Amino acid sequence: MRRAILTAAFALGICGHLRAHDVSTTPITWNREISRIFYDRCLSCHRPGGSSFSLVNYTDVQPRAVEIRDAVLSRRMPPWGAVKGFGDFRNDQALTPEQLELITDWVQDDTPKGNNPRMLPKMPTFGAQAPAAVPASAVRVAGTVTLTSQFMLDGLLPEHAADGVQIVAALPNGSVSPLLWLYGYSDKYRHEFLLRKPLVLPAGTIIRGVKPPASVLLLPAPSRGTH
């Protein structure tokens, strides 16, 4: 009887050992997951002919993998330059928590490339980009500004950014709307912050938080044609 129990226990141990090693996880690879993040978030700047070094191919990225991981975890890259949750922007290029986790795990697993190049996404194309024209009705804010008429706000464009600037709109009804909190922003990567939805700022709204010599443009929402 004792021998039978020992035999059964040994068999269970073997089965448990085999099951532990039978569990397989699919590795995160450049071809399947990581390239998609880079193509979507990085190549507007990091490509041949772009404003910074190329991150198009695995051979470009792999030697810099640890440096890239540290840069994205610290939110230095992509250079979005604003605190998430302070304002809501439709062109937010900051990486999601899921994307950050994928990059972190990929680097921890020694940056596998993957065996199937057909998993790579289609390479995005980029044409020549002229600086966006600033609408004549944009409002420049340097210091505290009180709006004399209603303004339909579509976004903000820092002209001379000061890190840490927190821009708010104090409405006549006493409420305060957070607009933009610059953090790690660089004029080298000057860009618009476009609101998820246009925001109506009534006459009498006070825009605060921009201390000279910093200045920010309030961008008007496109006017809708009448039908």
Describe the role of every protein-language-model region.
Residues 18-143, 208-226:
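Aromatic- and Gly/Pro-enriched helix-to-coil junctions and flexible linker segments
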